[in-house]
């Protein structure tokens, strides 16, 4: 069981970091600049990945790391859902707002601007991938990862009863 749970968390971390890798590919190879909401979704994927890796390493506090990973996922789901709603309403726009200034003033934007600096518009059209927008795919993967963490937590709780 121990090897299975390690593999479980490791796979979640790999998928999470792969999503960040896909975002960086789209940013640099496809020249799609990230908006503030995109950067916040990157934070969510990175949070899920880091907390999942900590769950692999620190077995005694695994439930804590799993819960924090779920919390990161819920935050990312809220942000991605908001961005999908913005894209569905063409009259709405987040434009250049205080959120962009706030995201770009974070230490991560200063330390790793290649990853965390926001330079795009939230409602900028992007080519669909298999018929869905990039934020919709982000929402789907955040839902999958968060639900996977939740199901694992529920199964473990049932196992210990």
Curated annotation (Swiss-Prot):
Residues 1-8, 59-63, 156-161 are cytoplasmic. Disulfide bonds join 35-38, 94-122. InterPro entries: DiS_bond_form_DsbB/BdbC, Disulphide_bond_form_DsbB, DsbB, DsbB-like_sf. Keywords: Cell inner membrane, Cell membrane, Chaperone, Disulfide bond, Electron transport, Membrane, Oxidoreductase, Redox-active center, Transmembrane, Transmembrane helix, Transport. Residues 26-43, 82-136 are periplasmic. It is found in: Cell inner membrane. It is a multi-pass membrane protein. Gene3D superfamilies: DsbB-like (1.20.1550.10). Its main location: membrane. GO terms for cellular component: plasma membrane. It comes from the Bacteria. The chain crosses the membrane at residues 9-25, 44-58, 64-81, 137-155. Pfam families: DsbB. GO terms for biological process: protein folding. GO terms for molecular function: electron transfer activity; protein-disulfide reductase activity. Required for disulfide bond formation in some periplasmic proteins. Acts by oxidizing the DsbA protein. Belongs to the DsbB family. This is Disulfide bond formation protein B. It comes from Cupriavidus metallidurans (strain ATCC 43123 / DSM 2839 / NBRC 102507 / CH34) (Ralstonia metallidurans).
